[in-house]
UniProtKB/Swiss-Prot annotation:
Family annotation (InterPro entries): Herpes_1 (IPR004999)
Gene from which this protein is expressed: TRX1
GO cellular component assignments: host cell nucleus; viral capsid
Disulfide bonds: none
Family: Belongs to the herpesviridae TRX1 protein family.
Major subcellular site: virion
One GO term (biological process): viral capsid assembly
Protein keywords: Capsid protein, Host nucleus, Virion
Name listed for the protein in its UniProt record: Triplex capsid protein 1
């Protein structure tokens, strides 16, 4: 047996098998079929019904038959030719089946992506927001809760009596300037149906910022672009309303809520219908009247919480140059008795909400202490008031403040109608959260990639003035809720 020579039939069969294998490998390489098809389609049909698996098996078998048909031809007498004659080749029907199966598997994912985008439409007066001037991608805020604020202050016993009158006066003047009914519930309802842009809000708070030069430039830019002779008076009265909310320990974040990024608007003389994106990517949102590919805000309002030069010690891993980062809307408060103030920023951090709150506690510890115990009593300077006492200990003023806050008595007969607003003491004998609140933040969105590539700076020129903007093209908006820091 070992010395037997193979006959011609065996040699022909071996040659035929070698030709078939080489032809199959060559056509698989050219057409991308064969063993590549199951590897590409396996993740798509993972968990699919058995019928789909049978379809894939039939497609693979027909693809192999098609390669044999291309290699040998229908007129050959080889085994590949006979097999191809018995089976159907990979044709248009099979391609249509693959396309339908792929679309059927991708459709739920596409629907889920579309469902993640949330758009809101609001009809608003254009006194405190100019959609045609702000431009797409600008942040808008709902101005809500004015009626609740008035009712709460009327029932509050720890505020100045004049504070309610100042708030009502500023609110009536603002309504009158905006052309709304100055009295009654109609004025409140119309005012609460309005939007406030981030630029207008920051322009109203310009006197309270420490970097007053940059924010004053923003205020001048807003006044020049608003084309409204009464806009300066509107900003002043809006500032008085927000100052009253800080002094009464209700804070602006209780009446201002982020509405989203402006996408498109239909403008009239004093009214506009505004569409805003609350959830989703601004870059992927389509159907816009003007190109809107990024979330934008003034550069003077930007606060980098990952920068050690601005915020001191940064936790390990928070100052990475790569990875994702979060974008927040941040309020900072100073609740001194006669000097209440507030600031608003757009902050960037690599930390989530829980980590950001701990970081803000470290960064603004001095502001937190000053808000707990006011530095300026109603009668004058804190230290001067203490030196006038017989015992000469200025710390006794804190004990007096504790007694006044606990007993709810008047501060001084010479101060008509004055109420102690320097300390709010809880039933446990410690300052409550309202008296110690120094900040509030709300998540706006998240972006992937390093900040250097995800951010770009542009300059907007209007009426001979220029304002620097920060643009975030890849930001995915996800408006959260306010979280107070105290």
């Amino acid at each position: 047996m070992a010395n037997m020579k193979p006959n011609l039939t065996d040699l022909f069969r071996l040659r035929e098998r070698a030709d078939e294998g080489a032809a199959r490998r060559e056509n698989d390489r050219l057409l991308g079929l064969g063993s590549t098809v199951p590897q590409l389609l396996r993740p798509v049909w993972s968990g699919a019904p058995t019928v789909t698996g049978n379809i894939i098996g039939a497609i693979v078998n027909r693809g192999s038959a098609g390669t044999e048909l291309l290699r040998t031809g229908p007129a050959t007498n080889s085994g590949g030719g006979r097999m191809a004659a018995q089976q159907h080749a990979f044709g248009a029907d099979d391609a249509a089946g693959v396309k339908a199966a792929l679309l059927g598997s991708i459709a739920p994912t596409a629907d889920a992506l579309r469902a993640q985008q949330v758009l809101t439409t609001q009809v608003t007066v254009t006194d405190m927001c100019k959609p045609d001037v702000e431009g797409p991608g600008s942040l808008m805020l709902f101005f809500r809760g004015v009626r609740r604020l008035l009712i709460k202050l009327s029932a509050e016993t720890m505020v100045r009596n004049d504070l309610i009158n100042e708030l009502e006066t500023a609110f009536m003047i603002l309504n009158r300037i905006c052309g709304l009914p100055p009295v009654g519930t109609n004025g409140i309802n119309n005012f609460e149906a309005s939007l406030v842009s981030l630029n207008v809000l920051a322009a109203a708070a310009a006197p309270h910022y420490r970097n007053t030069c940059e924010v004053d430039a923003l205020r001048t830019f807003v006044l020049a672009g608003g084309k409204d002779s009464k806009l300066n008076e509107k900003l002043t009265n809006l500032d008085l309303i927000l100052q009253a909310s800080v002094e009464s320990r209700n804070f602006p974040h209780s009446i201002l809520f982020p509405a989203g990024a402006l996408t498109e608007s239909v403008n009239s003389t004093n009214v506009a219908c505004v569409k805003m994106l609350m959830n989703g990517s601004v870059e992927l949102e389509g159907g816009l009247t003007r190109p809107c590919g990024s979330f934008r805000f003034p550069a003077c309002l930007f606060l980098d919480l990952d920068d050690t030069r601005q915020c001191g010690v940064v936790p390990r891993g928070a100052d990475r140059a790569d990875g994702l980062f979060y974008v927040y809307l941040l309020f900072l408060y100073s609740t001194e008795t006669w000097h209440p103030s507030y600031e608003i920023y757009v902050a960037k951090s690599a930390l989530g909400e829980a980590g950001l709150q701990s970081m803000l506690d470290e960064k603004f510890a001095r502001r937190r202490v000053n808000n707990t115990v006011a530095a300026a009593p109603p009668a004058g300077n804190f230290y001067a008031r203490g030196r006038q006492r017989e015992d000469g200990d200025w710390r006794c003023y804190i004990e007096d403040a504790y007694r006044r806050a606990s007993g709810n008595n008047a501060v001084n007969p010479l101060e008509q109608g004055a109420r102690p607003t320097d300390l709010h003491i809880s039933f446990a004998g410690v300052p409550d959260r309202n008296s110690a609140t120094y900040a509030a933040f709300c998540q706006l969105g998240v972006s992937l990639g390093p900040w250097s590539s995800a951010c770009r700076y542009t300059t907007v020129q209007r009426h001979g003035l220029g304002l620097k903007y920060v643009e975030l093209p890849g930001l995915s908006l996800k408006i959260g809720t306010w979280r107070a820091c105290y």
